[in-house]
């Protein structure tokens, strides 16, 4: 209350920002007459001068220079837009452009021209000469926006590219990323970053820098999708568990008797009776013994799949596959899979083919990907409700931009009914009334299931209508465009065609504009506001109203008993409703509870990913160093050799390596032969003084002698690629270990320990082990490289060429848990640890390892072991 009073007296923080930006608008407008008089060539030359000025400035001072040239850049961009696109930026759009340039979020209502606003900040920041990324939620919007704005950018001397899922060729992607301005989806940008850090050549990396990104529909990408990490994964070399058996057990269990459901936290809690029943059905004595860990995990996932996840709400079944429905957008998330075996549990539940589990090869959250950018900004129609999260997680302020024309839409109070049936009956009556009048109506539902229910009711009443949900997603833009036609009735899940305007004729405006009916409050107020925002664009008339019932999930799970109490006291008859500010406030409080739960969940995910992110950055930085032809790889190998020998000698008699027993010397001799391919006699070891120096010089001379056959460039290239393979293999195994650690870490809470603290501690120790493993594995592998003195280096070149070609053109499935081809797994295992004695020999002789290279030493050839 006090804050509101102070805001009215001295103005809010937002008001003060807008006031400052308006001063800049005056400066930009003052330049307009001069630029209007210029010819096209003169205008283009003026912009080229700005480029020269910015690019001639020291990198650290370029941001300051951008602010200095902002008025000229914005004025030229606006004049160019008038000539090329026949659109002039309004003053409020200039403010939006300045907000974006300042690295903030511009909250602009539907129809205010966010696509055009972005051109101001994009054109300004591209002056620096680094690619600017414009991020959208889907391929359709990325392609549409880039094509619409490309003529303007070309006039200003910029090149434009669009990254979509259909661009499969690596060279084509590389060419697109070389453009000044790149449009694309958040998934494509994120996956390209991960793929870049699996490349074996710096030249083949597509993302050269992360200077500036504008995220369109920023709330959808940075909030709604923040809980789903981007993952590139490969098949697990482990036996598949019986998901069908776990599904049978789960289906035989009874709610309340065998388990309870915590709907607020979406969790299943198994009772003692349930544990006994499961043990009996699985045929085990103790479900929670270490050897039954997989069974208990699969049962947990099967219970979730059967009792917390519902078809046509959380997922659909299409083409013998379980496809996720995004809970926030209502769109199908094709290719994305639930992790930790939940997706396989859903496949077992629905009786479709079960796909194997996968192992993470590379992953990152959207939070940590977008936080890499030197400057990040965003646009959306709904951001204020999540302003705290944007500031806390991304350090992004939200600025509400005034509309160009006043909003005329009427937002009516919610109507609350006792039952869902009564609510839908009332909705049908209202739709019929509006349809008969000719006023278009857009009906929002929270799930596919509810939209299908409404569809059946309208069909029964013979009211013509169109349904837009994840099952009809291919027609999304077309359906939404037609939602403003006379008499149109459109049922939509919360996907509701973001980014597509519903334009109205004068006749429709006379009828009252687009009427919005919400059939249920979403868990997030922001999603409700998005639905309202479909109506009343650019000063158009419109109306919005929500119809609720006590049986709606939000009110049933999170709602206050006060609402039910009010309904009972009033003694409402069937079909009657209440309309009260008290009830509306209670609904909003319930939404705030859920929003806070989701915020904590996203923050929790980020806290864990921040730990992995530091490790990821360290590994990727080292990877880039290895890819650099100027990197001194020989020094790194020498360092590893010294480390490996220190490890070996530390296990012998402490500080007394000169008085080793014959048994210890024999053990040292065998280790040197098996691990380092160094043939040293027992007599030489006995005579060596000091022994550490003798062994070190022996290993070094052996290695240098066999590498003489290669010229320096070829040697460096081979050493770097082999080291990269070792690093990638070790990183893959480290990620698998980290996944396992994260899965079970919450159990530490039962032991009065903070799971996050324990995770940080153990992940740090695991990372130290990972570094040690790389050093040991690297020196062992390099010690086994063999050449014949008389052979030339053609084998080496042939290997390098073949490896590069295989590695760079590996087929990849583009999805949230991407899967690499089996061939890549074979290639990446080329330099794995020494095989077990009964495994096939890696030299491909067809013999067992114990009967081949283990006995006779490495075969002659490039990388024989």
Swiss-Prot record:
InterPro entries: Helicase_ATP-bd, Helicase_C-like, P-loop_NTPase, SEC_C_motif, SecA, SecA_CS, SecA_DEAD, SecA_motor_DEAD
Membrane topology, from the record: Peripheral membrane protein
Textual note on the cofactor: May bind 1 zinc ion per subunit.
Pfam families: P-loop_SecA (PF21090), SEC-C (PF02810), SecA_DEAD (PF07517), SecA_PP_bind (PF01043), SecA_SW (PF07516)
Domain of life per record: Bacteria
Record GO terms (molecular function): ATP binding; metal ion binding; protein-exporting ATPase activity
EC number: 7.4.2.8
Subcellular location: Cell inner membrane; Cytoplasm
Any one GO biological process: protein import
Subunit and interaction comment: Monomer and homodimer. Part of the essential Sec protein translocation apparatus which comprises SecA, SecYEG and auxiliary proteins SecDF-YajC and YidC.
Protein name per its UniProtKB record: Protein translocase subunit SecA
Organism: Helicobacter pylori (strain G27)
């Amino acid at each position: 209350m006090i804050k509101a009073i102070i805001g009215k007296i001295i103005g809010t923080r937002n008001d003060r920002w807008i006031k400052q930006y308006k001063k800049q608008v005056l400066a930009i407008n003052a330049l307009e007459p001069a630029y209007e008089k210029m010819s096209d060539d003169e205008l283009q030359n003026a912009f080229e001068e700005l480029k020269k000025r910015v690019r001639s400035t020291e990198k650290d001072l370029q941001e300051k220079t951008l602010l200095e040239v902002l008025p000229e850049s914005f004025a030229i961009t606006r004049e160019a837009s008038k000539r090329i696109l026949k659109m002039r930026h309004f003053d409020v759009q200039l403010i939006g452009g300045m907000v974006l340039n300042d690295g903030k979020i511009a909250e602009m209502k539907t129809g205010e021209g966010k696509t055009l606003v972005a051109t101001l900040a994009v054109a300004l920041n591209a002056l620096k000469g680094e690619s600017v990324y414009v991020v959208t939620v889907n391929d359709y919007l990325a392609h549409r926006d880039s094509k619409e704005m490309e003529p303007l950018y070309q006039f200003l001397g910029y090149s434009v590219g669009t990254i979509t899922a259909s661009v499969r060729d690596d060279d084509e992607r590389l060419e697109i990323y070389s453009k000044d301005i790149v449009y694309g989806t958040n998934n494509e940008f994120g996956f390209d970053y991960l793929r870049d850090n699996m490349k074996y050549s710096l030249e083949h990396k597509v993302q050269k820098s992360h200077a500036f990104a504008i995220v369109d529909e920023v709330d959808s990408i940075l909030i709604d999708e923040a809980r789903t990490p981007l993952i590139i994964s490969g098949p697990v070399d482990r036996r598949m568990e019986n998901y069908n058996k776990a599904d049978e057990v789960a289906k035989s269990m009874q709610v309340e008797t065998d388990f309870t459901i915590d709907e607020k936290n979406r969790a299943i809690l198994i009772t003692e009776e349930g544990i006994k029943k499961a043990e009996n059905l699985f045929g085990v004595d103790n479900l929670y013994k270490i050897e039954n860990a997989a069974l208990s995990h699969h049962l947990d996932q099967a219970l979730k799949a059967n009792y917390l996840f519902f078809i046509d709400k959380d997922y659909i079944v299409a083409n013998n596959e379980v496809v996720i429905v995004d809970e926030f957008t209502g769109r199908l998330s094709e290719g994305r899979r639930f992790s930790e075996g939940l997706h396989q549990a859903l496949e077992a539940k629905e009786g479709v083919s079960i796909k194997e589990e996968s192992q993470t090869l590379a992953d990152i959250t959207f939070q940590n990907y977008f936080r890499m950018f030197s400057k990040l900004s965003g646009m959306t129609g709904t951001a204020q409700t999540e302003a705290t999260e944007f500031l806390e997680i991304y350090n992004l302020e939200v600025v509400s931009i005034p509309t160009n024309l006043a909003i005329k839409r009427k937002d009516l109070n919610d109507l609350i009914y006792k039952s869902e049936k009564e609510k839908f009956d009332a909705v049908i009556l209202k739709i019929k009334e509006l349809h008969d009048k000719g006023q278009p109506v857009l009906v929002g539902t929270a799930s596919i299931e509810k939209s299908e229910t409404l569809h059946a009711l309208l069909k029964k009443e013979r009211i013509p209508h169109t349904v837009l949900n994840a099952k009809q997603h291919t027609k999304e833009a077309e359906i939404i465009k037609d939602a403003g036609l006379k008499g149109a009735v459109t049922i939509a899940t919360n996907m509701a065609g973001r980014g597509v305007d519903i334009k109205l004729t004068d006749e429709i405006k006379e009828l009252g504009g687009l009427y919005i009916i919400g059939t249920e409050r979403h868990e997030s107020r922001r999603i409700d506001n998005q639905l309202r925002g479909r109506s009343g664009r650019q000063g158009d008339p419109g109306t919005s109203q929500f119809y609720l019932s006590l049986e709606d999930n939000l009110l049933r799970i999170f709602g206050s008993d006060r609402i039910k109490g009010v309904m009972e006291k009033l003694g409402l008859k069937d079909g009657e409703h209440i309309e009260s500010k008290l009830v509306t406030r209670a609904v909003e409080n319930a939404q705030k509870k859920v929003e806070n739960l989701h915020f904590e969940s996203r923050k929790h995910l980020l806290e864990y990913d921040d730990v992995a992110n530091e490790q990821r950055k360290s590994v990727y930085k080292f990877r880039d160093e290895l890819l650099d032809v100027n990197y001194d790889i020989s020094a790194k190998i020498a360092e590893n050799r010294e480390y490996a020998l220190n490890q070996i000698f530390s296990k012998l008699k402490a500080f007394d390596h000169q008085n080793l027993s014959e048994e210890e010397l024999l053990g040292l001799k065998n280790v040197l032969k098996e691990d380092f391919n160094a043939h040293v006699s027992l007599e030489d070891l006995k005579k060596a003084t000091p022994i550490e120096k003798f062994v070190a010089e022996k290993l070094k001379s052996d290695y240098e002698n066999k590498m003489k056959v290669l010229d320096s460039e070829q040697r460096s290239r081979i050493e770097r690629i082999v080291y990269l393979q070792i690093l990638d293999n070790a990183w893959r195994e480290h990620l698998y270990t980290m996944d396992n650690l994260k899965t079970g870490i919450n159990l530490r809470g039962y032991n009065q320990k903070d799971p996050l603290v324990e995770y940080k501690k153990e992940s740090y120790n695991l990372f130290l082990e990972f570094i040690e493993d790389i050093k040991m594995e690297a020196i062992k592998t390099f010690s086994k490289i063999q050449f014949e003195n008389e052979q030339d280096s053609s084998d080496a070149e042939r290997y390098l060429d073949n490896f590069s070609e295989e590695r760079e053109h590996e087929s990849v499935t583009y999805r949230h848990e991407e899967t690499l081809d089996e061939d890549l797994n074979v290639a990446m295992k080329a330099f794995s640890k020494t095989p077990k004695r009964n495994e096939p020999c890696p030299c491909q002789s067809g013999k067992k390892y114990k009967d081949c290279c283990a006995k006779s030493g490495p075969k002659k050839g490039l990388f024989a072991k």
